[in-house]
UniProtKB/Swiss-Prot annotation:
It comes from Mycolicibacterium smegmatis. The gene is groEL. The lineage of its organism: Bacteria, Bacillati, Actinomycetota, Actinomycetes, Mycobacteriales. Together with its co-chaperonin GroES, plays an essential role in assisting protein folding. The GroEL-GroES system forms a nano-cage that allows encapsulation of the non-native substrate proteins and provides a physical environment optimized to promote and accelerate protein folding. Signal peptide: none annotated. GO terms for molecular function: ATP binding; isomerase activity. This is Chaperonin GroEL. It is an enzyme of class 5 (isomerase). Belongs to the chaperonin (HSP60) family. It is found in: Cytoplasm. Its EC number is 5.6.1.7. GO terms for cellular component: cytoplasm. Keywords: ATP-binding, Chaperone, Cytoplasm, Isomerase, Nucleotide-binding. Forms a cylinder of 14 subunits composed of two heptameric rings stacked back-to-back. Interacts with the co-chaperonin GroES. It catalyses: ATP + H2O + a folded polypeptide = ADP + phosphate + an unfolded polypeptide.
Length: 28
C-alpha cells in the first residue's frame, strides 16, 4: 500500500510539474 500511495504522489507531482511547465511555455 505504501508503494501505491507513493506512486500516486509522484504522479501528482509529475502532473503538477508538467502543468507549470506548460503554463510557463504559454506565458512565454
Amino acid at each position: 500500500a505504501k508503494t501505491i500511495a507513493y506512486d500516486e504522489e509522484a504522479r501528482r507531482g509529475l502532473e503538477r510539474g508538467l502543468n507549470s511547465l506548460a503554463d510557463a511555455v504559454k506565458v512565454t
